[in-house]
């Protein structure tokens, strides 16, 4: 699930990078565009959508389940082994989707990865993911602070719902971006006084390690389930 810049001309470039890495490893990748059809092709990083247009993470979670339903119609997809992944606004969408029931689509996602999501949304709530969940975030993130994700993971683990968390020292928001680190004063940011301004940009070491983390995580949780016949051999 893409970030607040969408998949249009203002895209951060991170979704495309991940698509290449995952397809290299044999995964089929679907990237739903939640913004263009709703009239916000330039994203919602700086200006929110017009009144009546809902592109919240909770609404986009429904997009994720719609994509899951489409994937399950393909003969080359094992519907039991579909993962969900998103960054920033898409990471928050991933958290919302992994907490929402997708009962109308059958079984839900088998595993999910949320990159630098807004964990503060679930402050004061014990987060219970519907499937194994991995969160990757930088400790220099001033847009979606890592400390909130640490609290979410600790509360979930304390309730018997472990959430895997990896925090990268020195990494900012969008550490998987090909762009250099920069501060943009106009970005909507509920995490700072005044509600504007955030730092984003790539961190080569965090990016390289995150590829390993995601590959290993999906490798464990989306692995082929042997049939009973195979198990007896």
Regions found by a protein language model. Give the residues of each.
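Gly/Ala-rich phosphate-binding loop of Rossmann-like dinucleotide-binding domains
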Residues: 23-24, 98, 157
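Hydrophobic residues in well-ordered beta-strands that form the structural core
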Residues: 31-32, 86, 165
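Extracytoplasmic/secreted proteins, especially bacterial periplasmic and envelope-associated proteins
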Residues: 17, 21-24, 59, 63-66, ...
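Serine-hydrolase catalytic machinery in alpha/beta-hydrolase-like enzymes
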Residues: 1-73, 179-200
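Primarily recognizes the serine-hydrolase "nucleophile elbow" in alpha/beta-hydrolase
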Residues: 6-11, 54-130, 142
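The feature captures the conserved acid-bearing segment of alpha/beta-hydrolase catalytic domains
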Residues: 106, 110-170
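C-terminal catalytic histidine-bearing segment of alpha/beta-hydrolase fold enzymes
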Residues: 162-233
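Short phosphate-binding/catalytic loops that engage adenosine nucleotides
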Residues: 27, 76-77, 161
């Amino acid at each position: 699930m893409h970030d607040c810049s969408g998949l249009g001309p203002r895209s951060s470039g991170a979704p495309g990078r991940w698509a290449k890495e995952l397809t290299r490893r044999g995964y089929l990748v679907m990237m739903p565009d939640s913004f263009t059809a709703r009239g916000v092709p330039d994203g919602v990083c700086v200006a929110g959508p017009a009144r009546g247009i809902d592109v919240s993470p909770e609404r986009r979670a429904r997009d994720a389940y719609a994509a899951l339903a489409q994937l399950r119609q393909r003969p080359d997809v094992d519907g039991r082994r579909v993962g969900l992944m998103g960054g920033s606004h898409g990471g928050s969408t991933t958290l919302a989707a992994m907490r929402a029931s997708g009962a109308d689509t059958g079984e839900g996602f088998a595993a999910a990865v949320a990159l630098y999501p807004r964990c503060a949304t679930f402050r004061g709530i014990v987060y219970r993911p519907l499937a194994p969940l991995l969160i990757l975030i930088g400790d220099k993130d001033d847009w979606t602070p890592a400390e909130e994700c640490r609290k979410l993971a600790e509360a979930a683990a304390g309730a018997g719902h472990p959430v895997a968390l990896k925090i990268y020292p020195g990494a900012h928001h969008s550490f998987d971006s090909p762009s250099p680190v920069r501060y943009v004063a106009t970005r909507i940011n509920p995490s700072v006084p005044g509600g504007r301004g955030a730092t984003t940009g790539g961190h080569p070491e965090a990016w390289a390690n995150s590829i390993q983390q995601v590959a290993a995580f999906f490798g464990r949780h989306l692995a082929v389930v042997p049939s009973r016949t195979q198990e007896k051999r």
